[in-house]
Amino acid sequence: MARPYPVGVFAPVATTFTSDGALDLDRFRANMEWYATSSLDGIVIMGSNGEYVSLSPDEKLALIEAGVKAVDGRKPIVAGTGVESTRGTIELTKAAAELGANYALVVTPHYYKPRYDKAAYVRHFHAVADASPIPVIVYVMAAYTGVDLPVDTVVEIAQHPNIVGIKDSGGNAPKVAEMVARTPEDFGVLAGSANFLYPALCLGATGGILALANVAPDACQEIVQAFRAGDHERARATQFRLLAPNAAVTTRFGIAGLKAAMDMIGLHGGDPRPPLLPLNDAERAEVRRIMEEAGILARA
């Protein structure tokens, strides 16, 4: 039986906070309702854009529960459950499954990375997958963790039947090609950023988990649908149009930029949790200009 690998456009949604920094579940539920009726193929709770490293264990569970209930089965829910220990990851993954998550997104442990070799990562991910009631997606985010799993390690990890895909945010086209070529056909390779979605699809990726999809799900879907239809000219043109806005909500302004863009389109973004800082007025104006020029936001 083929593994239920992830396909299409997923948004790693932001976590909403009150003015004093507490979780704001009401605004989070409102955002989830919007995403549930959007063109997205799935929703990721507690990815990097969800500020998962700044959340307590109880907050993580509350967020998963609120998101699952708000979406109510209309989209698959991927829950970020990776922590530094194998035991802790298993515990959170089981809890996420009990709350109704459909997949677990497990980031690479990284704090002791000088001692983490291929054997350590294979054992970690296989142990999590053995214990997980739901399919597992490996998450590689080298820009934040400093860990870029080599293809040989990914290939061995991918042999586990309950590990169904990988989100790789590196944008390394040769690596994407090699992962697709050397992993099983029912293992999904997902682009981790919209800035290389079209090239990744051309190399055999099955979709992407994309920060930009929080504010431009239709535009991200346009790349996927044009690619599937063989309209490479439209897919490439859309890819080019999304380069600047994607940078604005990722490498250039980060989570604060994404949340500002969410506010601009009518979603609840708000401020990130400290020590992350919100945008200043000039940065916010620059995000607005970029979103308007890309057609994501109507000109004032």
Region locations from a protein language model:
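A general structural signal for well-ordered alpha-helical segments in protein cores
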Residues: F10, F28, K60, I64, ...
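C-terminal alpha-helical cap/extension of soluble enzyme domains
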Residues: G8-A14, S38-L40, C202-A205, I209-L212, ...
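Short glycine-rich loop/turn motifs that provide flexible caps or phosphate-binding loops at active sites
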Residues: V7, D20, D41, M46-N49, ...
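Alpha-helical structural signal in soluble globular domains
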Residues: S38, A62, A66-V71, A95, ...
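Helix N-cap/beta->alpha junction signal
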Residues: S85, S193-A194, N280
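Active-site beta->alpha loop and helix N-cap motifs at the rims of alpha/beta catalytic domains
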Residues: A2-A11, T16-D148
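Short, amphipathic alpha-helical "lid/cap" segments that border enzyme active or binding sites
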Residues: L25, R29-M32, V151, R284, ...
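Catalytic alpha/beta core domains of metabolic enzymes, predominantly
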Residues: D130-A131, A142-T250
